[in-house]
From Swiss-Prot:
The lineage of its organism: Bacteria, Pseudomonadati, Pseudomonadota, Gammaproteobacteria, Legionellales. Belongs to the RnpA family. This is Ribonuclease P protein component. It comes from Coxiella burnetii (strain Dugway 5J108-111). GO terms for biological process: tRNA 5'-leader removal. HAMAP family: RNase_P (MF_00227). The keyword Nuclease applies. Keywords: Endonuclease, Hydrolase, Nuclease, RNA-binding, tRNA processing. Its EC number is 3.1.26.5. The gene is rnpA. RNaseP catalyzes the removal of the 5'-leader sequence from pre-tRNA to produce the mature 5'-terminus. It can also cleave other RNA substrates such as 4.5S RNA. The protein component plays an auxiliary but essential role in vivo by binding to the 5'-leader sequence and broadening the substrate specificity of the ribozyme. GO terms for molecular function: 3'-tRNA processing endoribonuclease activity; ribonuclease P activity; tRNA binding. It catalyses: Endonucleolytic cleavage of RNA, removing 5'-extranucleotides from tRNA precursor.
Amino acid sequence: MEKGFSVGWRIRTTAEFRRIYAARQRIIGRYYLLYYRENEIKHSRLGVVASKRNVRKAVWRNRVRRVVKETFRIRKKDLPAFDIVVVAKASSVEADNKELYECINKLFTQLERQSKRSSSV
């Protein structure tokens, strides 16, 4: 299993983020919003947004990002070929790591279900 979060797995440019937001497909969780869009490559890619406006302190922003990246790293082989942007809500500050992991896992599971549903139609 890969340990890092290399460039090939990341969404990097503003244009890519805008394209995903424009697709208007999202799943809402308690601590995160997950935006997604099918991509042309064979694997999923991730972008994480934890803005100063929602998550004030850098320590909190880094923790929120770290939880998302780690969960993605573990589950990326099971995820469908989507570009995924995870946006941290202000409520994520009050959650402990266990709650954050549970929330992001639930969102990734819902994404897998939706992709299976849309591919069978």
